[in-house]
Amino acid sequence: QNNHLWRGMEVSDGIVLLTDLSYTMANDHVTVGLWGGCNSEGSYKEFNHYLNLKAGGWGFALWDTYNFSPGATYNNKEYWNYSAHTTGRFLDATLSYRFQEEKFPLLLSWSTVVFGRDRNSDNTKQKYSTFAYAEYPIYQKDGWKVDAGVGGAFALNRAGEDAHFFGTTAGIVHVSLQATHDLKLGNYTVPVYAKGMWNPQSNQSYFQIGAEIIRF
């Protein structure tokens, strides 16, 4: 893909390669995995561990995220540092629910940074920055799918400050529209997509295109 977008932010520009190695068990209810990303310029590097649980329309995900890009302003040289005051990683927990009615497949999710580099300016308290998100498939037919999403962010513990992990103050930080298509190439199917993302708070917008090249 041509960049890496996440919750209203452009994590990386340039050509980005993302990889995902996972194992699913317990009748598809539990998935553990490793997720990595890098860009063509070498200015973006990320390696994460994750756990996903699902049952019915409910889902729970815990991501241990470590972005060790060379230009990072935080600790990006100690992978196994889990000290709250000095770690360069963060733990992100998400509870989600997808309505199972065919005519109303709304997705709702609540994500909170529960540990790591989400501290106040004095590095004395965790802010527990939270991202609340809603997504709805507005079109799905003939191998095409279009999803619209909106997300807001705030800190559960402001710690005397307005800023949080996702922005400068509480508010809408993510509006998106994504079109996905299963492209047929002979005997192969390549999922491709195009996505527009807008951040009203930062007055920024981004466009992303991507494809899933290999799956096994």
What is each PLM-predicted segment?
Residues 1, 53, 192-194:
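Transmembrane beta-strand segments of Gram-negative outer membrane beta-barrel proteins
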Residues 70-71, 84, 88, 98-106:
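Structured domain cores in non-transmembrane regions
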Residues 25, 99-193, 197-202, 207-216:
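Outer-membrane beta-barrel transmembrane domain signature
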Residues 27-83:
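Surface-exposed loop and membrane-interface regions of Gram-negative outer-membrane beta-barrel proteins
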Residues 1-39:
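Short glycine/proline- and aromatic-enriched beta-strand/turn motifs that initiate or cap beta-hairpins
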Residues 12-14, 44, 127:
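Short, surface-exposed loop/turn motifs at beta-strand boundaries within globular domains
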Residues 5-9, 21, 37-39, 50, ...:
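Outer-membrane beta-barrel proteins
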